[in-house]
């Protein structure tokens, strides 16, 4: 249960990037919201598959955690938080798993390499997308929507098989914070304040 919907979604995102041409050695893959549930699994999966992973976080104290999952570069959230001023920036990222949306996603689109793809999995930073179509028209960037609810059965089987094969168990264990039902009110407050990292595994029998 520690993998959960977040881990399943992360695997779907990685598969979508692969289906749209992501291969090892073409440059770093960006993961926004990297210390969260989806982001943590995405970092671990991409690193295990041999990709150079750049992890975006607004919490400096999570750097050691993210590097332990396999991130090779830590990108401060502030570096990508400003709204788009130029529709295109230097081509930097070979792929991206984005859990943030909003202004950060708009900024990332302008930094993608030619023909690269962004898998959008969340909207922690907002549902609006203050971007231009220039990255799509001049660099052939792909924006891929990831839905974990209505996936066909065969794709679900494929994703879970990939999780079993590609997600290192030691990395999964490093993401888990055990909790009980009595801990839930405090955990709720921590979630709203952005203080939770990785996955919380609630023992309903404790």
Which ranges hold each PLM region?
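A glycine-rich, Thr/Ser-enriched phosphate-binding loop motif common to dinucleotide/cofactor-binding enzymes
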Residues: 1-18, 35
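Residues at the starts of beta-strands that form the adenosine-phosphate
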Residues: 28, 51-53, 117, 142
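Glycine-rich phosphate-binding loop and adjacent beta-alpha segment
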Residues: 103-169, 204-206
């Amino acid at each position: 249960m520690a993998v959960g919907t977040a881990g399943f979604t992360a695997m779907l995102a990685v598969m979508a990037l692969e289906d749209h041409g992501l291969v090892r050695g073409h440059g770093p893959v960006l993961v926004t919201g990297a210390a969260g549930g989806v982001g943590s699994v995405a970092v671990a999966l991409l690193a295990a598959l041999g990709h150079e992973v750049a992890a975006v976080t607004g919490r400096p104290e999570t750097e050691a955690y993210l590097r332990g999952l396999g991130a090779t570069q830590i990108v401060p959230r502030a570096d990508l938080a400003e709204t788009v001023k130029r529709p295109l920036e230097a081509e930097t990222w070979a792929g991206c798993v984005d859990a943030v949306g909003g202004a950060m996603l708009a900024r990332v689109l302008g930094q993608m390499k030619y023909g690269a793809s962004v898998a959008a999995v969340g909207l922690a930073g907002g549902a609006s997308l203050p971007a231009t179509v220039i990255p799509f028209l001049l660099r052939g960037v792909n924006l891929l929507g990831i839905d974990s609810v209505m996936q066909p059965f065969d794709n679900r089987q494929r994703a879970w098989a990939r999780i079993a094969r590609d997600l290192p168990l030691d990395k999964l264990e490093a993401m888990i914070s055990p909790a009980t039902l009595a801990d839930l009110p405090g955990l709720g407050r921590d979630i709203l304040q952005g203080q939770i990292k990785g996955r919380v595994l609630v023992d309903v029998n404790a």
